[in-house]
């Protein structure tokens, strides 16, 4: 099976891009970030390229490259463009594909469209990345509830951070969702340490079945 997987998070800056890089390398998949907001200092696609070890042709070009590091709806407004759903159809490519969203599920793309609306349209399995720090239970369960209300399939939750197994277990029990594993904070962080962590912490079959 050649999976197409959406990676989203309970919040911004939780390690979603690092996870996406690790997953793309783990599955030898292509990577696509539909909307990049903020171009100074490098993009998420360039970071994934460095951390995944994938060849350049596996890093698909963004549909929207916006200059301002802000919510996509605002970054697009500043650039004088509007993000439309029809422009965000999933690329038809051979092989597996990892798609990374921006921020969380309720991030607006324009005045009447949220990222979760796009995910519902795609109807692809979602990996929800959640931090392990204090507050994650509420954020994770709200995100699971939002996905379920839209009928979006959930592949499972990938936790990122230090080991807080009680929080992870209660989220998965109450949310009735699969625990995919936990990606620890890595120092140093490079493609070798990231792939080693994925091989230790995750099972490939959980993403392909």
Swiss-Prot record:
Q: Which Gene3D superfamilies match?
A: P-loop containing nucleotide triphosphate hydrolases
The record's keywords, sorted A to Z, are: ATP-binding, Biotin biosynthesis, Cytoplasm, Ligase, Magnesium, Metal-binding, Nucleotide-binding
Instruction: Supply one GO BP term.
Output: biotin biosynthetic process
This entry's Enzyme Commission designation comes to 6.3.3.3
Any single GO molecular-function term of the entry would be:
dethiobiotin synthase activity
Top-level division of the source organism's lineage: Bacteria
* Compartments where found: Cytoplasm
- Pathway connected to this protein: Cofactor biosynthesis; biotin biosynthesis; biotin from 7,8-diaminononanoate: step 1/2
Which residues does the record give as ATP binding sites?
13-18, 100-103, 184-186
- Sites binding Mg(2+) sit at 17, 47, 100
Q: Which InterPro entries match?
A: DTB_synth_BioD (IPR004472), P-loop_NTPase (IPR027417)
Report the cofactors: Mg(2+)
Q: Name one GO cellular component term.
A: cytosol
Q: Which residues form the active site?
A: 33
Q: What does the record give as the reaction this protein catalyses?
A: (7R,8S)-7,8-diammoniononanoate + CO2 + ATP = (4R,5S)-dethiobiotin + ADP + phosphate + 3 H(+)
Family affiliation: Belongs to the dethiobiotin synthetase family.
Q: What is the purpose of this protein? A: Catalyzes a mechanistically unusual reaction, the ATP-dependent insertion of CO2 between the N7 and N8 nitrogen atoms of 7,8-diaminopelargonic acid (DAPA, also called 7,8-diammoniononanoate) to form a ureido ring.
Under NCBIfam families, the record lists: bioD
Subunit composition?
Answer: Homodimer.
Protein name (record): ATP-dependent dethiobiotin synthetase BioD
Q: Which organism is it from?
A: Rhodopseudomonas palustris (strain BisB18)
Species classification:
Bacteria, Pseudomonadati, Pseudomonadota, Alphaproteobacteria, Hyphomicrobiales
Q: Which gene encodes it?
A: bioD
């Amino acid at each position: 099976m050649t999976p197409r997987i959406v990676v989203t998070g309970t919040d911004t800056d939780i390690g979603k891009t690092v996870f996406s890089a690790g997953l793309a390398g783990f599955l030898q998949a292509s990577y696509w970030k539909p909307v990049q907001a903020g171009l100074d200092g490098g993009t998420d696609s360039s970071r994934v390229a460095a951390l995944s070890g994938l060849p350049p042709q596996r890093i698909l070009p963004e549909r929207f490259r916006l200059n301002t590091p802000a919510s996509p709806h605002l970054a697009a407004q500043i650039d004088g463009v509007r993000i439309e759903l029809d422009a965000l159809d999933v690329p038809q490519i051979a092989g597996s594909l990892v798609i990374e969203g921006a921020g969380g599920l309720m991030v607006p793309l324009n005045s009447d469209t949220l990222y979760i609306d796009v995910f519902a349209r795609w109807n692809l399995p979602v990996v929800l990345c959640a931090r392990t720090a204090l507050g994650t239970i509420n954020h994770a369960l709200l995100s699971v509830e939002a996905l379920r209300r839209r009928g979006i399939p959930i592949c499972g939750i990938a936790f990122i951070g230090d080991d807080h197994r009680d929080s992870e277990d209660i989220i998965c029990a109450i949310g009735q969702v699969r625990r995919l594993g936990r990606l620890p904070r890595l120092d140093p962080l490079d493609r070798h340490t990231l792939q080693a962590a994925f091989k230790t912490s995750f099972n490939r079959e959980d993403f392909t079945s």
